[in-house]
Amino acid sequence: MMKGKVMARAGLDKNVVVEKAAQLANKMGIDQIQLKMLAESLSIQPPSLYNHIRGLDDLRRELMIYGWKQVEKRMLEAAAGADGYAAWEAVCRAFYQYATENPGVFSAMLWYNKYQDKETQGVTEKLFSICFAITSSLNISEENCNHLIRTFRAFLEGFCLLVNNNAFGHSLSVEESFDLSLKVMIGGMKELEGK
């Protein structure tokens, strides 16, 4: 290698960088990730990361997008073959499972705003489409579907955040609490049929 030059590692691309960052985030927490640490885990020099990301803030944004793409894939798979309230429940459970299995990436996902720019708008396009298809099949209006997406997002993200931070201290099963909460939430959805 020529002095002063940083050679790119063969096979290294943005996807590899983001996936390695996701592994580190899940293991150590998103706030613990530093570019030097990420570079070392990839066996490259820190300046080489700038061939793929613009810095730490950009890396966090990429992790947010990565997480939403991953969770969208899981939720769409969960909804396949189900319909109505069973499909809605399936996508909620898929979100919960992904978020609690990937706590570091989930932390990056929390501040996602679909309307921030074109890239973020495209990230969950299929997911929103399936949500609208499910609620439409239940005779729930598009306006109320938007309210439901916000409501369930707040419930799911809040519940998962508490689980990931071990904030439920009672000995009752967290899984049972989630099941009950989801049942109550879906019961409330039924009040919106025809509205």
Predicted regions and their residues:
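Alpha-helical structural segments
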Residues: 16-23, 27, 41, 58-78, ...
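Amphipathic C-terminal alpha-helical segment
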Residues: 108, 154-171, 186-195
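Amphipathic alpha-helical packing segments from all-alpha helical-bundle domains
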Residues: 114-151, 176-187
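Hydrophobic alpha-helical connector segments
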Residues: 76-104, 142, 149-152
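Base-recognition residues in the alpha-helical recognition helix of bacterial helix-turn-helix
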Residues: 50-54
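Append "Primarily bacterial transcriptional regulators
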Residues: 33-40, 49
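Amphipathic alpha-helical segments used for helix-helix packing
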Residues: 96-117, 159-169
